Each structure stands twice: as C-alpha cells, then as structure tokens.
Curated annotation (Swiss-Prot):
Disordered: region residues: 854-894
EC number from the UniProt entry: 7.4.2.8
Lineage: Bacteria, Pseudomonadati, Thermodesulfobacteriota, Desulfuromonadia, Geobacterales
Catalyzed reactions per annotation: ATP + H2O + cellular proteinSide 1 = ADP + phosphate + cellular proteinSide 2
Gene3D superfamilies with a match to the protein in the record: Helical scaffold and wing domains of SecA (1.10.3060.10), P-loop containing nucleotide triphosphate hydrolases (3.40.50.300), SecA, preprotein cross-linking domain (3.90.1440.10)
Keyword Translocase in record: yes
Textual note on the cofactor: May bind 1 zinc ion per subunit.
Protein name in the entry: Protein translocase subunit SecA
Membrane topology: Peripheral membrane protein
Gene Ontology annotations for the cellular component aspect, listed alphabetically: cell envelope Sec protein transport complex; cytosol; plasma membrane
Assembly behavior: Monomer and homodimer. Part of the essential Sec protein translocation apparatus which comprises SecA, SecYEG and auxiliary proteins SecDF-YajC and YidC.
Length: 894
C-alpha cells in the first residue's frame, strides 16, 4: 500500500525515465526546421563534422540531439519515413545501453538507425544483431540506405561468406548480422594462426533485435564448434532396437510405515518425468536391458557408456517427438526451435542424443562430435562495452535482464492508442472439443471476411488443424518450420480480407501484418512470377495493388481488424504476448482469444490438478466451455512456475559457464599474445624458468642431504625436457641446497638454449616457439574441454555426499585448468629443446599439417574438414618433420 502511494506521488521508475527524456525530444524537434533546409551534401557533411567534434573531446551525449535530427531527416529523404517522438525515445534508451520494449508495428527497425548512426561516429563499429539471415540482409539493405546517404558504410554478416567478405563487413561503420554468425566468428577467430586472419574487431556496441529471444530463449543453447570423433555408430542402432520392447510405467504413491507415511513404487520398465524432461529405467527395466543386450551388469564401470546410450535412447523415444521437437528432411534430423518454431540446420543435440534420435528415425547416424570451442550467448554478448536491445515483450523478464546482463528495461509508449481487446481464455476438458470450437469460430469469422491468425505451438498441431480446416472447405495458409522459405510472403498477406493463416510461434518473424495486405510484397511476388515485364508495366501493376490494399484495409478495419486465435498457451507468457502483438499495430483495431484444454501440455504437466478441481467445482460437463478468472489465474501461475524453472536453468548454466569463461579468456588472450609475437621469447623463457623451478622443487628436499636426493630421477627428467644429463661432481653435490641447484640448472639450460639460438638464428627460433606454442595450446585446450564435459556430467552426484556441486565444480575445473597449463609448458619446452635444424619446407609442412588437424565450422553451419594439401602422409614411426629427431608418434603426432 505504501509503495503504491509513493508510486502515485513520484511515478514509477519507467515514468520517471520517460519524463527525463522528453525535454531531449523537444530539443531534437526544435532542430528539425533548420536541418530540413540543408542540401543533401550539407546533410551528409554533418557526419564528418560530428566525427571531428567527437575527436576534439565532445561526448556522444552532447552530440545526440543534432545527430538524431540529422538521422531523422535522412530517413524522410531516403525512405519517406519520419521517426516519431516515441521512436526518438526508443533510440535514446538504446544509446544508454538499455532494453527498449516497443510493441509490434512501432518501427523497431527504424529506431535502431538512431543509436547506430550516433555510435558509428566513434569509428569503433556498431553491431545490429537479428535472429535470421533474411532479416539481417533486409535491414542492412533497407535501413542501410539511411546510413549510406549520410556517408557511413554498412556491412552484413550472413551464412556463406568467406573470411575476406566477413572482414570487410566487420570493418564497416555499422554491421548487421545474426547472433549465431557473430558468435561463431568469435570462436573461429580464436582458432586461427595469424592475427591478420581474424575477421572481427573489438566489441564496442551491440543493438540486439528480439533481445528476449536471443538473450533468454537461446541462452540455454551454447554455440559449439566441434570435430567428429572416430567412435562406431553401430551401438546406436543396436540399442535403439531394444527400446520399443520396454514397457512404460508410472510412479505410484502407496501408504507405508515411513516418516512421510508414503513411499513410491515404480511400475513398468521405465518412467517418464515430463517436467524434468527425463526418462529413468526401473529395477525391472535394468534387468530386462541386461538380458536383451546380453551384459551382466549395466552399472559395471566397463558398461557405463552403454548405460548412458540406453538413457539417451529412452529420452529420444519417450520425450522427443517428430514434427514437434524436430523434423526429418532429406534424410537428416533437424532441430525445431521450441520458441520460434524455426528449423535450426547445423545445430545438433549433444551427448549422443542426436545420434539416438537419428537411430530412432532410421536415418544415417553422424558420428558424435568432440568440442573444439564453445561459448554461450550470455558470455558472448557480455563482452561488448555497451549492450542494448529491442523487443515487443521484455517487461516480464526484466528481473533476469538486470540480474544476468545488468540491463534495465524501459517500456516505450505506443505512437497511437492500442485498440485490441484481449478476451479471456476459453477452456474445454478435451483437445477434441477445443479444436471443434476453434474450427467453428474460424468458420464464422471467415464467412464475414475478418482475417484470422491461428497460433499453434508445434508443427504437428498446425498440420492437424490445417487438415480439420481442409475438411470444412476453408481456404488457409500454413506457416511452420517446413514452409519457412515462404515465411515473409505468408505473413505479409495474413491481414487480407477473409484470410486464414495457421502459424507456429510467431516470435521474431520480423514482418508486419498489414490490414488489407502488403502492396509492396504483392508487387514483388508478381514481379518474380513475371520477370520479363517492363518497368512501366510493373509500376502500373504496383499502383493497382496499392489501390486494392487501401480498399481492403478499410473493409478489414470495419470488420474488426485481425483476430488472433491462440490454440494453446506457451510455457512463456512472453511468447503468448508476441502472438497477440501481431494484431492492433499502429492503432489498428484487432482482438485476441486463447482456446485451451486440460489435455494441453502446459496444463497437463504443470497445472491440471488445480484447474481440474475448479472445473469439477463449477460442474463443467463435456463439450461445455468455461471462461473464469480463477482458471486464467491458475494458468498464469503455471506459466510463472515454468518461467521460474527455466530462469533457474539459465542461471545454473551461466554459473557453470562463468568458470569456463574465465579459462577461455586466459587461453584466447594467450593465443593473441603469441600471434602478436612481441613478447614470445619472454613468454618462453618464463616457461623454461618455471619448469626448472618445478624440477628443483620436486627432487631437492630441503631437510635431506643433497647426496641422498634422487639424482638419477632428476637427470632423466632434465634429459627428457632439455636434452642433457645432470653431471655434478660429488664434492659440488655436497654443498648444494634447493636454491643453488635451481640456479645451477638454470645456468646450464640458458647455455643450451643460447646454443640453439646461435644455431637456428633469432627469427627461426621465434617462429618455431610460436608454432609449437599454438599447437600445444590448441591440442591441450581441446582435451581440456572434453575433461570439463565429463566433469559436468558427474558433478551432480557430489550432492549425495553432502557437498555443493557448484563449489566442487569450480575447484576441480580450476585444478584441471592448472594441470593443462602445466602440460602445455612441458610440451612446448620439450619440443623446443629437442628440435633439430630442418629445411624451411619441413617447417612449413609442419604448420600446414597442424592446420589440417583442426576442424572449423564453415560459415557457422556444419563442421567440415579443411581440404588437405597434396603431400606425403607421415608414418607414425617415421622421423617427425619438425626436426626434433624423435619419431612422429612421440612428437607432433601425439
């Protein structure tokens, strides 16, 4: 009550923020008349003027009013679009490094031109991040016209570009691209062998479109660059064949003489927990699997991998559904994004799950992959000096944005009042009743000509509904992951009179639904069908389409605008709001309603008990619908439960990934330092000194006479690392202590290294140090990532031993990292001290071979091995081409 009173007096935080920005809007508006009198050249020259003023010490904040006024004028001249006052506020919020929540149709794409123009003045680059290649290309061409007019260069990063094209795009003033491409480019850069091969610049300022989709929905999926392992794929087929023979059971609670008075009994061969997305073998199931696979003990350490594959095969059959979680296209299993309904080619589930699903569907099984480089979107975007974002729905996740990204959300008012009533949910007992009601409403609205957008949560449901409409003879379009090529075309026409469109999740579709249809899209489509027509004919047809759409627009408005019909609530309220948000844009009329049933996943898994009780209490019969505030509240509570659960998963992921992130930063910084080559000799000498100190410490025991030290062990270790034996006269030996032993060894090691430098020359020795360091770091880092994966898998079990798994993970991951750094040091020192003079072509061949051993993602899509150059393959027992004098298998072929 007190907080409500305070809010009434001083306004909410959002209201105070908007109040602070309105005077700056006034400043920009006051500049408009003067700016509009400038010629095109004078307007363009303003960019150079701003750069000079910034160079002389003026801040971007002081340049903002004039820069925004210039950008607004360019928009009017080039695109015929003038930024509204609320769009200026949106631009200021983005410039401040915050999230601007702007409703659908409020022109987020145009808003981004303001802060991107202002921040491009620094010359440090601006990244505008979108969810797919289509939007990246469209926005760079469309909005890029404003920036090009003002003398700035615009680049675009999309799938299929080579490194030269990528570098050129990143060097532009403003770069449009997808989150995946930006992330993969970062990982690929940190696998390269020369700084000049890097494509990205420093991380200055990013504007993330559909920020909730990228930073929240996709945050659970890390970006991974991987190479295939050599494991056999037969095991997946063998295990897949036994899963249909297992019987699904359930968990039964029985009364028992226990503390709680109850105990759980498991029936069948396995049980499924849909909330936790897990499937577990019962005791009976374990015995049955052992019998079917002819193994004695499934939990024997030798068969632990088989147990893992059985569990993954169970999940594949019990939890992952065709046309819901994935599709099979051209003999390949492709993941469907659960939030946007888009296909995600190139993405694979890890840990053998993807292979289990491939076996289930009877398609070719690809080998499991080993991680070579990985990063989460959370940690990638936190590298930017300044980060901001736009979306139609961020306020529900404001707490998460603040906690994880330190980003505040500002809700921007709409330019025109929202006229869309959102009707209460209608709930039925069964899905069949619900779908019958949906069909009846669609039939009724279609008959009077009102356009309808029907939202479903999976491909399977969209096709089921489409079949029901087909039987009723109602013409309709279907938009799901299978028809994504026609996406923009279908969405653009969804507002036409009498149009019925069925769509899976509408998140991030990026195309406005215009009432009466989109004349521009219709013209483009007509031109594609009639490529031979003259420009004159095309202009004439375009004018006809325009006239037709204006007429239809008025008719559709009089019918009530676009009606949104949701057929199921999503786990996230945000996705529901995004579906609703497709209607009522820019003051247009519209309406929305959700039809639900107790058999829907959300209600069945998270809220059915409470809702069922309410329906029983209200004595709802089959076939009868209910609209009640209590039900709506129960559904929203179920959604909040799921959202909180998903937030915990993401927070858990980032807590674990933060450990890896610090290690990744150390390794990548070390690689960059080596590639820069300025301190490479000093780094190597430091490694040598550390190795000597470790040897002295390991063999020279403080309180034991020097004559009793393990001299043979020391001599062998020194020989292994540095290539010489320790030969100390007995009289000298007696006077030694750990400190002067270290000095003695250091002196001898420096002498041997100086001889190497004299023999090879400074240039060649530095080159060899660089090549060998990179080779060791990359090989050891790859193995370290595998060790970390294994550590993650088993760390949860520490909880049973009364230990905090997170703390144990941090401790052990740190120890693994330190062990890896020790191995890198030993490997580098040993190889340099053992290296022999080799011909220049041998060194080049070694470098080439080292590059070929790596696997890189081709444009962020699928892993492909680089084509090997034509050269003789080195046998494992042949001398190593690096010139170390060792066999290849004991040197670079390890």
């Amino acid at each position: 009550m007190f907080s409500a009173l305070i809010k009434k007096i001083v306004g909410s935080k959002n209201e105070r923020e908007l109040k602070r920005l309105w005077p700056i809007v006034e400043q920009i508006n006051n500049l408009e008349a003067g700016i509009s009198k400038l010629s095109d050249d004078q307007l363009r020259n303003k960019t150079s003027e701003f750069k000079e003023r910034y160079g002389r010490g003026e801040t971007l904040d002081s340049l903002l009013p004039e820069a925004f006024a210039v950008c607004r004028e360019a928009g009017k001249r080039v695109l015929g679009m003038r930024h509204f006052d609320v769009q200026l506020i949106g631009g200021m919020v983005l410039h401040q490094g915050k999230i601007a929540e702007m409703k659908t149709g409020e022109g987020k794409t145009l808003v981004a031109t303001l802060p991107s123009y202002l921040n491009a003045i620094t010359g440090k680059g601006v990244h505008v991040v979108t969810v797919n290649d289509y939007l990246a290309r469209r926005d760079s061409e469309w909005m890029g016209r404003i920036h090009n007019f003002l003398g700035l260069r615009v680049g675009v990063i999309i799938h299929g570009l080579d490194d030269e094209e990528r570098r050129d795009a990143y060097n532009a003033d403003i770069t449009y691209g997808t989150n995946n491409e930006f992330g993969f480019d970062y990982l690929r850069d940190n696998m390269k062998f020369a700084l000049e091969d890097y494509v990205q610049r420093d991380f200055n300022f990013a504007i993330v479109d559909e920020v909730d989709s990228i930073l929240i929905d996709e945050a659970r999926t890390p970006l991974i660059i991987s190479g295939p392992t050599e494991d056999s794929t037969d095991k997946y087929y063998i295990i897949d064949r036994i899963i249909p023979l297992l019987k699904k059971g359930e968990v039964v609670e029985e009364e028992a003489n226990t503390l709680s008075g109850k105990r759980k009994r498991y029936t069948g061969d396995y049980t499924v927990d849909e909330k936790a997305k897990s499937a577990t073998l019962t005791e009976e199931g374990v015995l049955k699997v052992e019998k079917l696979l002819k193994i004695e003990n499934l939990y024997d350490p030798r068969d632990i991998e088989t147990l893992h594959h059985v569990n993954q095969a169970l999940r594949a059959h019990a939890l992952f559904k065709l046309d819901v979680d994935y599709v099979v296209k051209e003999g390949e299993v492709i993941i469907v994004d659960e939030f946007t309904g888009r296909l995600m080619p190139g993405r694979r589930w890890s840990d053998g799950l993807h292979q289990a699903i491939e076996a289930k569907e009877g398609v070719k099984i690809e080998n499991e992959n080993q991680t070579l480089a990985t990063i989460t979107f959370q940690n990638y975007f936190r590298m930017y000096e300044k980060l901001s974002g736009m979306t139609g729905t961020a306020d529900t996740e404001a707490e998460e944005f603040h906690k994880i990204y330190k980003l505040d959300v500002t809700v921007i008012p709409t330019n025109r009042v929202l006229l869309r009533p959102d009707f209460p949910d209608v709930i039925y007992k069964t899905e069949r009743e619900k779908f019958n009601a949906v069909i009846e409403e669609v039939k009724e609205l279609h008959a009077k000509g009102q356009p309808v957008l029907v939202g479903t949560i999976s491909i399977e449901k969209s096709e089921e509904l489409a079949e029901l409409l087909r039987r009723q003879g109602i013409p309709h379009n279907v938009l799901n992951a299978k028809q994504h090529e026609k996406e923009a075309e279908i969405v653009a026409q969804a507002g036409r009179k009498g149009m019925v469109t069925i769509a899976t999740n509408m998140a991030g579709r990026g195309t406005d639904i215009l009432l009466g249809g989109n004349a521009e899209a219709m013209s483009k489509q007509w031109r594609r069908s009639n490529p031979e027509v003259s420009e004159e004919e095309f202009t004439k047809v375009s004018a006809q389409f325009k006239e037709q759409c204006v007429k239809e627009h008025d008719e559709v408005v009089s019918l009530g605008g676009l009606h949104i019909l949701g057929t199921e609530r999503h786990e996230s309220r945000r996705i529901d709001n995004q579906l609703r948000g497709r209607s009522g844009r820019q003051g247009d009329p519209g309406s929305s309603r959700f039809y639900l049933s107790l058999q829907d996943d959300l209600l069945r898994i998270f809220g059915s008990e409470r809702v069922s009780k309410i329906m029983d209490m209200l004595k709802i019969e089959e076939g009868e619908a209910i609209t009640h505030g209590l039900i709506t509240k129960a559904i929203e509570n179920a959604q909040r439960k799921v959202e909180a659960h998903n937030f915990e998963i993401r927070k858990h992921l980032i807590d674990y990934d933060d450990v890896m992130n610090k290690q990744r930063e150390v390794i990548y910084a070390q690689r960059r330092e080596i590639l820069a080559g300025e301190t490479i000799r000093e780094s190597f000498v430091e490694m040598v000194n550390d190795a000597v100190a470790d040897l002295a410490e390991g063999y020279a025991i403080e309180k034991v006479s020097a004559t009793e030290w393990d001299w043979q062990g020391l001599s062998e270790s020194v020989f292994k690392l540095f290539g010489f034996h320790v030969d100390i006269p007995p009289q000298t030996m007696e006077r030694l202590n750990p400190g002067n032993l270290r000095d003695l060894l250091q002196e001898k090691v420096q002498e041997v290294f100086s001889e190497k430098v004299t023999e090879f020359g400074d240039e060649l020795i530095d080159h060899l140090i660089k090549v060998i360091m990179l080779q060791s770091i990359d090989a050891q880092w790859k193995d370290h990532l595998l060790s970390i994966d294994h550590l993650k898998e088993g760390i949860g079990l520490r909880g049973y031993g009364q230990k905090d798994p997170k703390q144990e993970y941090k401790k052990e991951a740190y120890q693994l990292f330190m062990d890896m750094m020790g191995r890198i040091r030993e490997e580098v020192v040993e190889k340099i001290f053992w290296v022999q003079i080799a011909r220049e072509e041998d060194v080049e061949r070694m470098e080439e071979q080292q590059k070929r051993q790596r696997l890189v993602f081709n444009a962020g899509d699928e892993p492909q091995a680089q084509q090997p150059a034509t050269s003789k393959k080195v046998g494992r027992n042949e001398p190593c081409p690096c010139g170390s004098g060792k066999k290849y298998k004991q040197c670079c072929g390890k």
